[in-house]
Amino acid sequence: KQGGGYGDSRISLRGFDQTNTSILINGQPVNDMENGRLYWSNWQGLTDVASGIQIQRGLGATKLAVPSVGGTISILTKAVDKEKGGSISQMIGNDGYSKTVASYNSGKSESGWATSVLLSKWSGNGYVNNTSGEGFNYFTAIGYAPEGSKHELNFSFLGAGQWHHQRDVWVSIRDYQNFGDEGIDQRWNSNGGTLDGEEFSMRRNFYNKPLATFNWDYKINSKLK
């Protein structure tokens, strides 16, 4: 975690941060084009829809993207890989966190078609003061892989509209002591407070970044991977 806001997380490979690590979703790079960072709050629903995750550590002749120093993380969402079925779940956590998820997978039909759909909504107050947030996730995928064929087609569309308040300042122990109601308060946040009886933050993150991908996989023979 960094900052304490929802989704303000990070991943390090071999000691290198995300600016030196390529993150791919169905082969599409999603690192920021200007600074190389990745904002996980934009891809919150990936944990619910991923059918596979591939990690290559360090420099190498990767076939997925330009090699990076830290490595490459490839996240796959294939409809034909999911078994038939559906589910509805409700999750409740500390600090007012709740998440509702509904999903359905058609499974692979005799003709080779498969469909997956997922919708979810979350909200929470955040562990740090004045870091509440709310968001919704959407995902749909259509796959086609007939029996005996060396070709597999997959179309995916996903996104995670969200907003959340952040804490992006370095807080000293003295600040924790001075502003805590009962001694040291690790939840104290100088970026926010109350305005007209409602939570207010000078650091409000809001985004919706839909991603559509189309993949055509051709397996020439069993010796090639």
Predicted regions and their residues:
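Transmembrane beta-strand segments of Gram-negative outer membrane beta-barrel proteins
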Residues: A50-I55, G71, T77-I92, T115-V117
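Transmembrane beta-barrel wall of Gram-negative outer-membrane proteins
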Residues: G85, I92-S123, V128-R167, Y207-I220
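Short beta-strands and strand-coil junctions in structured, solvent-facing domains, enriched
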Residues: N20, V30-N31, G60-K63, G126
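Short sequence motifs at beta-strands and strand-loop junctions characteristic
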Residues: G3-G5, A65, G93-G96, N130-E134, ...
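Extracytoplasmic loops and strand-loop junctions of Gram-negative outer membrane beta-barrel proteins
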Residues: N35-G36, I55-R57, K84-S87, K121-G126, ...
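Extracytoplasmic beta-strand/coil segments of soluble accessory domains associated
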Residues: K1-P29, G45, S51
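Short acidic/polar hinge/loop motifs at secondary-structure boundaries
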Residues: S12, P29-R57, L76
